[in-house]
From Swiss-Prot:
Source organism: Staphylococcus aureus (strain MRSA252)
Annotated positions binding Mg(2+) 2: D108, D110, D123, E126
Protein name per UniProt: Nucleoside triphosphate/diphosphate phosphatase
Entry's Gene Ontology molecular function annotations: magnesium ion binding; nucleoside diphosphate phosphatase activity; ribonucleoside triphosphate phosphatase activity
The enzyme's E.C. designation: 3.6.1.15, 3.6.1.6
Species classification: Bacteria, Bacillati, Bacillota, Bacilli, Bacillales
Binding-site list for Mg(2+) 1: N90, D106, D110
Amino acid sequence: MVRESIPKEGENIKIQSYKHDGKIHRVWSETTILKGTDHVVIGGNDHTLVTESDGRTWITREPAIVYFHSEYWFNVICMFREDGIYYYCNLSSPFVCDEEALKYIDYDLDIKVYPNGKYHLLDEDEYEQHMNQMNYPHDIDIILRRNVDILQQWIEQKKGPFAPDFIKVWKDRYKKIRQY
């Protein structure tokens, strides 16, 4: 059943990541919604329980702001560490929401961005392996490659979640909501 409305500010939701074959990949138990629109969901979490597909669990180490967009095939996790802000970008389907969680399909490719602005494309071998195993359609491959380019442009241009004011605004908003 589809959620009738977008997640509301202050609401706590789960985030569920799937693989192309429909199997659950990873679940974040709780993320606080900072902004929810038809196109963008921004959330915050800290020391959140994460459950892997094999049942293993772990807890995130630092506060993070998460960014999802309904028109782009990626999502971004901004992690606040002692030595600066790190970004972990997942190439994924656009998000959908229902009563259970915010959901997306993880397509293996990732970009890690360091505090100095340098970045690396990760997991290309895993992507090739899963593309063959799960029969990713050629159209999906084209879309994902195009979104890698878009994401790299955003990183280089400090656009969207990579903009310095984005970090300040949403980190402050998360702190404020957590105080209530």
